[in-house]
Amino acid sequence: MDVVLAGADSLWVLRRARSDAALGLARGVPAPAKTRAAELAAIADVLPDGFRPLGSKTPLDLTYFSRRQRPFLAAVHAVTHLSPVLEDTYLLVTGAGENGVRLFVEGPALTLSHMAERLRVAVGHGSLTRTAAFFRLMGLASELCGTYARDPSNPASGDCAWKVDVLCGSEELRRSLSLASGVRGVAEARRVASLVVGGSASPTESLLAMAMSLPVELGGVPLPAFLHNEELAWPKGARQLVNHQTMTPDFYWPRHAVALEYDGAVHEDRKNVREDHRRQQDYAACDIALVTSQADDLRSAHALERLMRIVALRLAPCEEPGFMLLVEQALQDSSASSMRTTLLSQLLPLRPEGREDKKRAPAGDKSLHS
């Protein structure tokens, strides 16, 4: 029996498969054209530990490929996929199937499209603003193209899984969405994918990438393009001066010789303080200006704008004379500042007092992914 999960249930298992070493995701395995997913007891046996109980009050989201296949069960919320099934439309969950049952989840493009549709409905009901919905979808796209995964059961305040395999690059996501058809939410998913920066290692990095790359009307600051989590090429002759053979700045502008790194709670113990000192020495030895940021720089739009101004000042010597004027106009734009406030609220909501993730990377609003 083949089981193809849909919607929120698919996203739950997708996240668990990314973060659980016992599970995996296989690409290039075509989803079945026919499914017989009506045996709930058998389905429950292959769902990962921690998945919610199945029942009529909490129906399981399942995909079927014809209207005839849809079961009339109170415990199943059936989604019909009638458009062509392309490669990587669905991913096989390895390590979960047993007794002849294969478990599939939606791939990144379909996941993003279905979330876009859910958020559109929420906006229509008045439970969410259009701006908040946009940034929530941006956050999910960044996660899908990044190396972190939010807690599937508690994405709002649960800990993230770090250093997980990338599901897809931003270009791959855009390509997959361009080929998708007949899927609700795909238009908004394409819009978001056209703006997302791939490669973020935490929600905090995703937020900073958005702040430094989005158009001004969406809350961004007009900074030059950056490299994101790419290995630094040491200047010629620098290897005898540095402590590290390689380094990977969070954000780096090679032409400007400027790097930006986020120092979260993980950097506060003595061992990591020494490591940070060595990294700062390496940057200085190579004449690279390092800007560091911490949680306080993301407490408010004003704090974020202060950080963006510092970064811009480091970049300014290699830019045109009017560069800082454009930056200041963006930073002082009240509409753009309001956008940045919403960005912060959706990607880094307030945590319980005294609680901070290992990398200061709290998850987004629970309703974003539940």
Summary of predicted features, one role per range:
Residues 162-370:
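Surface segments flanking catalytic/ligand-binding clefts of nucleic-acid enzymes
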